[in-house]
């Protein structure tokens, strides 16, 4: 009996350590009032993306859910309007596996929305296939699609600067290796899928790094955010059906809820004072160092050029900084600009809101300013 009690105590102690070090996510503070600002969140019909969109809506932002499924996207928008009390949550169709869909989304957004303050690339997949254009599906959805979308929306992001781009990455980037001669290589079998997934996560981190370099002094900053181990649809989607009932209780015990997974992306989108850390990788709401492959500026630029080619970007569609990226009358005291009043747009079912030194030391100062969590209850 004593042995059983001792064993139970050890198991409980081990779980407490796992819970506080892996499962429990630190809270996101940042700006509490986003009224008059607009955010786009991809893959926001479930999981981390939906919780991210919910918190943005609760803080008053106009939130565009960019999702592939119209049925699920509109249902999520309805849920979020009900939960947040904010009618400025809408759905717009976006399939990151299709370059044509990405361009159509950008055209529709730019023609109907007068501003963009926050762009969060949350959508992602973990298994592979081939798109109609014969692309590696993992590469297209996890990197090329977001890369193209960012480029197409940059004029709006620059016009609303200071603004932010957040790329939801993963600790899997540590296992990634990019073969620039075969970026679009076919992926066959689950082992290759695991490697290819890690490669796309490395691409996310390098993309954030190079984008920050390209947009230096424009007022647009970019961050790679690791949500942590999250119990989301992405985790169980490709698990055999017979195994899911066995894994669900375990996942509930040792993985974060989507609400916890949303904290670091929200931190990168909202925390004031982190602009000097643009291009860095965040986990648990603070900067983390990455392996050499993920901070290789030469590889990041090479990936940038290869991605332009794969995305079909022309010479005039690069992310070169504008000479005067911010208006002279901008007096925003916070890290995101105070928007000007907006007129309702014709394609929206709801009216637009009226506006109302040392790296370690720097990181410590930023962390000290984090406000208490606004709960996603």
Swiss-Prot record:
Binding site residues for NAD(+): 46, 48, 197, 201, 232
EC top class named in words: oxidoreductase
UniProt-listed PANTHER family: DEHYDROGENASE_REDUCTASE SDR FAMILY MEMBER 13, PHOSPHATIDYLINOSITOL-GLYCAN BIOSYNTHESIS CLASS F PROTEIN-RELATED
Known EC number: 1.1.-.-
Active site: 197 (proton acceptor)
Broad class of the protein's primary localization: secreted
Official protein name in the record: Dehydrogenase/reductase SDR family member 13
Molecular function per GO: oxidoreductase activity
Biased composition (Acidic residues): 317-331
Signal peptide (residue range): 1-25
Origin organism lineage: Eukaryota, Metazoa, Chordata, Craniata, Vertebrata
Region (Disordered): 309-377
Binding, substrate: 170
Function text: Putative oxidoreductase.
Top-level taxon in the UniProt lineage: Eukaryota
Biased composition (Low complexity): 347-357
Tagged with keyword NAD: yes
């Amino acid at each position: 009996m004593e042995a059983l009690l001792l064993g139970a105590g050890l198991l409980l102690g081990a779980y407490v350590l796992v819970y506080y070090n892996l499962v429990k996510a630190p809270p996101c503070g940042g700006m509490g009032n986003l009224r008059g600002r607009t955010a786009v969140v991809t893959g926001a019909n479930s999981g981390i993306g939906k919780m991210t969109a919910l918190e943005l809506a609760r803080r008053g932002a106009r939130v565009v859910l960019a999702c592939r499924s119209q049925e699920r996207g509109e249902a999520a928008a309805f849920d979020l309007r009900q939960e947040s009390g904010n009618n400025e949550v809408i759905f717009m169709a976006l399939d990151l596996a299709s370059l044509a869909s990405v361009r159509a989304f950008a055209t529709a957004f730019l023609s109907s929305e007068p501003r963009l303050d926050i762009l969060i690339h949350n959508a992602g997949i973990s298994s592979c296939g081939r798109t109609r254009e014969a692309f590696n599906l993992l590469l297209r959805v996890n990197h090329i699609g977001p890369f193209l979308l960012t480029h197409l929306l940059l004029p709006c992001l620059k016009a609303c600067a200071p603004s932010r781009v957040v790329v939801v990455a993963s600790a899997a980037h540590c296992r990634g290796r990019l073969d620039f001669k075969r970026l679009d290589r076919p992926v066959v079998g689950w082992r290759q899928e695991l490697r290819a997934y890690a490669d796309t996560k490395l691409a996310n981190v390098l993309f954030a790094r190079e984008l920050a370099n390209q947009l230096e002094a424009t007022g647009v900053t970019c961050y790679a955010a690791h949500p942590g181990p999250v119990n989301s649809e992405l985790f169980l989607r490709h698990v055999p059906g017979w195994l899911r009932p066995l894994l669900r209780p375990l996942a509930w015990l040792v993985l974060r809820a989507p609400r916890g997974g949303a904290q670091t992306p929200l931190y990168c989108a909202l925390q004031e004072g982190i602009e000097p850390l643009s291009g860095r990788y965040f986990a648990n709401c603070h900067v983390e160092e990455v392996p050499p492959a993920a901070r290789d500026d030469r590889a990041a630029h090479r990936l940038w050029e290869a991605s332009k080619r794969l995305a079909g970007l022309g010479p005039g569609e690069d992310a070169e900084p504008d000479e005067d990226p911010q208006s002279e009358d901008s007096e925003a005291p916070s890290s995101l600009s105070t928007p000007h009043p907006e007129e309702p747009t014709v394609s929206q079912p709801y009216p637009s809101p009226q506006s109302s030194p040392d790296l370690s030391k720097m990181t410590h100062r930023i962390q000290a300013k984090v406000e208490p969590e606004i709960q996603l209850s």
